Amino acid sequence: MKKALLALFMVVSIAALAACGAGNDNQSKDNAKDGDLWASIKKKGVLTVGTEGTYEPFTYHDKDTDKLTGYDVEVITEVAKRLGLKVDFKETQWDSMFAGLNSKRFDVVANQVGKTDREDKYDFSDKYTTSRAVVVTKKDNNDIKSEADVKGKTSAQSLTSNYNKLATNAGAKVEGVEGMAQALQMIQQGRVDMTYNDKLAVLNYLKTSGNKNVKIAFETGEPQSTYFTFRKGSGEVVDQVNKALKEMKEDGTLSKISKKWFGEDVSK
């Protein structure tokens, strides 16, 4: 009986070790693939970029030409150009963006991504935008004037965004949406009280849309920077993108693009 048990134990142990070895082999293969990512990108001559295409003025379609444009689109296109690459944009809803990156549908995300709570999972470029969060309400809403008024109110947010965390931390009840456009629509319909979003995006919306039905109730939080975002292990690709960004900062190109879209340099 003891011999039978010992034999069974040895079989199980060997199987477990084999499984661990296979897991390590698979992990090594995955790391090798990511390590070869830059070589693969160079060979294809194409940088594949995930972006929303619905987040004006960062990534959206021009109303007249339907061409994908925006600050993020222009910056990453210039980065690729300096690296001798073309850009292939893959438009994706925000809440599916990181799943697309993880599944290697694209090499990088260009969509105003913050680092908070993501640094353990992803690699990031140097920053290329700095802004603050604002809270938007209906024009005639006089109940929300500061962070202290948010608790118990309903805020429309993309569930995987940092703005969702700001709303939740302030005590708001969150209604999930696909982006800022839907959030603003729900505010005007009276279905939610507010939304947290980027100051630059909201100012641009108010300027270009002429919408008088919503307003910025207040600014909140510390200045937030945004970064191009990569899978972990994309080291050489990140280095190359940072090299191009550094050149763009030094020769004034990044500042020029920033002033074109916002009237000031928001890249610092």
Curated annotation (Swiss-Prot):
What Gene Ontology cellular-component terms does the record carry? plasma membrane
Q: Where is the lipid attached (N-palmitoyl cysteine)?
A: 20
- Subunit structure, briefly? The complex is composed of two ATP-binding proteins (TcyC), two transmembrane proteins (TcyB) and a solute-binding protein (TcyA).
| GO terms for biological process, alphabetical | amino acid transport
Q: Which PANTHER family match?
A: ABC TRANSPORTER EXTRACELLULAR-BINDING PROTEIN YCKB-RELATED, MEMBRANE-BOUND LYTIC MUREIN TRANSGLYCOSYLASE F
Keyword Signal listed? The answer is yes
Q: What SUPFAM superfamilies would the database entry show?
A: Periplasmic binding protein-like II
Q: What name goes with this protein?
A: L-cystine-binding protein TcyA
Give the family from UniProt: Belongs to the bacterial solute-binding protein 3 family.
Position of the signal peptide:
1-19
Tell me what topology the record assigns in the membrane: Lipid-anchor
Where is the protein localized? Cell membrane
Lipid group attachment sites (S-diacylglycerol cysteine): 20
Q: Which UniProt keywords apply?
A: Amino-acid transport, Cell membrane, Lipoprotein, Membrane, Palmitate, Signal, Transport
In terms of InterPro entries, this protein maps to:
SBP_3_CS, Solute-binding_3/MltF_N
- Tell me, in a sentence or two, what this protein's role is: Part of the ABC transporter complex TcyABC involved in L-cystine import.
